[in-house]
Regions:
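Bacterial N-terminal signal peptides that target proteins for export
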Residues: 1-9
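N-terminal signal peptide c-region/cleavage motif recognized by signal peptidases
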Residues: 21-23
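N-terminal leader/pro-regions and domain N-caps
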Residues: 25-52
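C-terminal edge strands of extracellular/lumenal beta-sandwich accessory domains
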Residues: 27-37, 65, 86, 92-103, ...
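Non-catalytic, beta-strand-enriched accessory regions in extracellular/secretory proteins
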Residues: 43-70, 74-85, 93-94, 143
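Alpha-helical transmembrane helix bundles of large polytopic membrane transport and channel proteins
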Residues: 96, 104-119
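Extended, solvent-exposed segments with strong compositional bias
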Residues: 113-149
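Alpha-helical transmembrane segments forming the membrane-embedded cores
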Residues: 209-357
């Protein structure tokens, strides 16, 4: 009993640290949308909410995002690209379009603007080193950051383009003065548009992060086989152990089997975090956000060990009491909050809490 209290005290401490750090460092990932022109721009409801809008560009493409801002409100923009695309020379343009803005930089001929609008073309060069992000975990090049107050109330547009020319901007607010330049851009590449500054999540956005993680790894250029290799190997090792002990396992109740499988999925998530952390660190420099990844790893592994340990206890453990239901319900909730188990792990933990613990017959 004391050991179980220590386990859950440790997990509770991780939850506190995790949720104190998450709002300050994480962005809501968003995928999809067309936005081929200002008229069909991808509309953003709350431009102050911090999010990353992921997309892909072919050569010559421009993608438009529209949002409404009141005069004096902050407009915060940023642009990131995968490490592989950046190493190939893909550096898309980032342009802010709006009322009260003076044209700065060389505005592309293909850029569409409503009448009376101005455009700020952000100038930048590829950074020396990619950035490590601890929650996914991932690595990327951060190309540009832009933070101004809206000069007028109205609709503003952020345009990301894979165009063949980009020039520096003039004016006191220029981010970097690089001089007019012509550059060839690869045929296509991926990008992430950062918009907003308030780090908030809805419950749905938070719980659905595991699906977004897979999409982000794909955005980076990873294949599904590579993404799921750590999880598959962990499950394979666990199932092999079950097979070798099949004479014992055959007498397990459905609740115990569900608990063991939930534990394996939690452990597999921890192995995936380790795997992705090593991949990302091999591309980027060391960052303090590594400690966020360690929290994710320890949480997933801790949940996995706890689920398996509880499942292997004597079959009469928790029968007819609230203890078993409480423990596995807690594991299921923690799995959802820590993005452990790819949804299936928490589901199996809840199943273990509900199914009969004692094997019939």
């Amino acid at each position: 009993m004391r050991q179980g209290i220590l386990w859950f005290s440790g997990i509770f401490l991780l939850v506190v640290i995790y949720f104190l750090s998450a709002p300050a460092l994480a962005h809501v990932p968003v995928f999809g949308g067309e936005g081929k022109s200002p008229e069909t721009a991808i509309h953003i409801e709350d431009p102050s909410k911090s999010r990353v809008l992921y997309g892909e560009l072919d050569s010559g493409d421009l993608r438009y995002y529209g949002f409404n801002v009141e005069k004096g409100e902050r407009i915060v923009l940023g642009l990131i690209i995968p490490v592989e695309d950046g190493n190939k020379g893909f550096t898309p343009s980032l342009i802010l379009i709006g009322q009260g803005l003076a044209d700065e930089g060389k505005v592309p001929e293909k850029l569409e603007m409503p009448e009376g609008y101005g455009a700020k073309v952000l100038s930048y060069s590829l950074p020396e080193s990619p950035v490590y992000e601890g929650f996914t975990p991932s690595a990327f090049y951060s190309l540009a950051k832009f933070d101004i107050k809206a000069p007028e109330s109205g609709t503003y547009y952020a345009a990301v383009g894979a165009i063949q020319e980009a020039g520096s901007r003039k004016g006191e607010d220029a981010i970097q003065e690089k001089g007019l330049q012509e550059r060839e851009i690869p045929i296509e590449g991926n990008y992430g548009l950062i918009l907003g500054y308030k780090e908030t999540f809805t419950l749905k956005e938070w719980i659905s992060i595991p699906l977004s993680q897979i999409k982000i790894y794909r955005w980076e250029g990873q294949g599904l086989f590579l993404i799921f290799t750590p999880l598959v190997l962990t499950l394979a090792a666990g199932l092999l152990a079950i097979f070798l002990k099949r004479e014992t396992v055959v007498g397990f109740s459905p609740a115990r089997i569900s608990g063991i499988l939930a534990g394996l999925l939690f452990l597999g998530t921890g192995m995936s975090y380790i795997f992705q952390m090593l991949i990302s660190l091999s591309k980027s420099s060391f960052s303090s956000e590594v400690f966020i990844t360690f929290i994710m790893i320890f949480a997933s592994v801790g949940l996995g060990v706890a689920a398996i340990a509880l499942s292997l206890k004597d079959e009469s453990y928790g029968t007819g009491s609230a203890s078993k239901r409480l423990y596995f319900s807690g594991l299921g909730i923690a799995g959802l909050l820590f993005w452990a188990g790819w949804f299936i792990g928490p589901f199996l933990a809840f199943e273990a809490a509900l199914l009969p613990w004692k094997h019939k017959g």
